[in-house]
From Swiss-Prot:
SUPFAM superfamilies: Ribulose-phoshate binding barrel (SSF51366). It is an enzyme of class 4 (lyase). It comes from Buchnera aphidicola subsp. Schizaphis graminum (strain Sg). The keyword Membrane does not apply. This is Imidazole glycerol phosphate synthase subunit HisF. Keywords: Amino-acid biosynthesis, Cytoplasm, Histidine biosynthesis, Lyase. IGPS catalyzes the conversion of PRFAR and glutamine to IGP, AICAR and glutamate. The HisF subunit catalyzes the cyclization activity that produces IGP and AICAR from PRFAR using the ammonia provided by the HisH subunit.
Length: 258
């Protein structure tokens, strides 16, 4: 059995780590390098860096800090932000990232998923999906350009259909960003996760809503996700990573010990 993963998310804007609520009103929370060191020392399994404005500003994520991160940590990390081509992915991987994640660019050109997977392998190819519950349609819908609240808009894709599409195109992992829950710290959207899990045959990472240790357990136990991603509870030290891992081990989960 593969160990379940605990992942820290670092949203990056203009070279610093920020955090918002439901992808809005971001505040600075710290420095990229110092937070990377801290989380590695505390025993996190993986880091994910999202340059939240790269796609909306039509630019590639700043590679200078990627190289610095690669030099100071010894755990896998994934980078997302403005990746529009195989060459962009190559640049980021060559600076030391273990995986790349695409989101808005995959919606524009789904074949980009296939091209990246064929070139670097599915293990390097992550697709992020920003999902929002549309109360009028009573459906979960995919959002695009979520790094800028003024440019965010709802696509025609239902989340469940897009999950199936990206798998067919070669996604090796899916990060489901549940926007309705993001930053609220009242738990992951287990209902949505369960529905997505039925259709998702690749590793599924839950993102959005963690507020306490039990929320992580619920995502693993009730929805059988492969990893849980969180930001606020780690940035603010609401949840201690080592304590979280021992809590999950006591619950019977396979977790990498710090």
């Amino acid at each position: 059995m593969l160990a379940k993963r605990i992942i820290a998310c670092l949203d990056v804007n203009n070279g610093v780590v920020v955090k918002g609520i439901q992808f809005k009103n971001h505040e600075i929370v710290g420095d990229i390098i110092s937070l990377s060191k801290r989380y590695t020392k505390e025993g996190i399994d993986e880091l994910v860096f999202y340059d939240i404005t790269a796609s909306t500003n039509n630019k590639l994520v700043d590679r200078s800090w990627i190289k610095k991160v690669a030099e100071i940590i010894n755990i896998p990390f994934c980078v997302a932000g403005g990746i529009k081509s195989v060459e962009d992915a190559q640049n980021i991987l060559s600076f030391g990232a273990d995986k790349i994640s695409i989101n808005s660019s995959a919606l524009i050109d789904p074949d980009l998923i296939t091209k990246i997977a064929n070139r670097f392998g599915v293990q390097c190819t992550v697709v992020g999906i920003d999902s929002w519950f549309d109360s009028d349609k009573k459906k979960y819908m995919v959002q695009q350009y979520t790094g800028d609240a003024n440019r965010t808009y709802q696509t025609d894709w239902e989340t469940i259909d897009w999950v199936e599409k990206v798998q067919k195109k070669g996604a090796g992992e899916i990060v489901l960003n549940m926007m309705n829950q993001d930053g609220l710290q009242n738990g992951y959207d287990l209902s949505q996760l369960n529905e997505i899990r039925k259709k998702c045959k690749v590793p599924l990472i839950a993102s959005g809503g963690a507020g306490c240790a039990d929320h992580f357990y619920q995502a693993f136990d009730h929805a059988n996700v492969d990893g849980v991603l969180a930001a606020s509870v780690f940035h603010k030290k609401i949840v201690n990573i080592k304590d979280l891992k021992y809590f999950l081990i006591q619950k019977g989960l396979e977790i990498r010990i710090c």
